[in-house]
Amino acid sequence: MKINHVAIYVNNLEKTKEFYVKYFQAKANEKYHNKNTGLQTYFLSFPDSETRLEIMTRPELSGREDRAMNEGFIHLAFSVGSKEKVDELTERLVKDSFRCLSGPRTTGDGYYESVVEDCEGNLLEITE
């Protein structure tokens, strides 16, 4: 058994798609738009991964405050292959004004990682 995809709602579908394309080398499928419900989605595929990220939006979405302290979904983790790549990507995101919540650092359980927010405030863990 394996995870096929994870889906998240976002407010700005196009901006979110471009974020993952630019920083995580995602490839997007053709946008799906259900004219009856207003739902719009992209499936994003990533190099060397079979698991996809589905980003979705609809007109009636409302935001949540303090996402890190809610039950349920906490973060997505991306393995980039080395400590140097963790450092480089984290530095690039911070330079482009995305918020870094921690790291890069070695955690108590031995992982080298940083935690940043994407353009929608979703938490991303960048690991080696």
Listing of model-derived features with the role each one plays in the protein:
Residues 9-51, 57:
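Core segments of cupin and vicinal oxygen chelate
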Residues 1-2, 128:
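Absolute protein N-terminus
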Residues 36, 47, 68-70, 106:
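A generic structural micro-feature
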Residues 17-18, 53, 87, 124:
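Alpha-helical elements of the RecA-like P-loop NTPase motor core of helicases
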Residues 56-62, 128:
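Acetyl-CoA-dependent GNAT
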Residues 48-52, 61, 83-86:
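Short, charged/polar surface micro-motifs in flexible loops or helix N-caps
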Residues 3-11, 42, 64-128:
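Vicinal oxygen chelate
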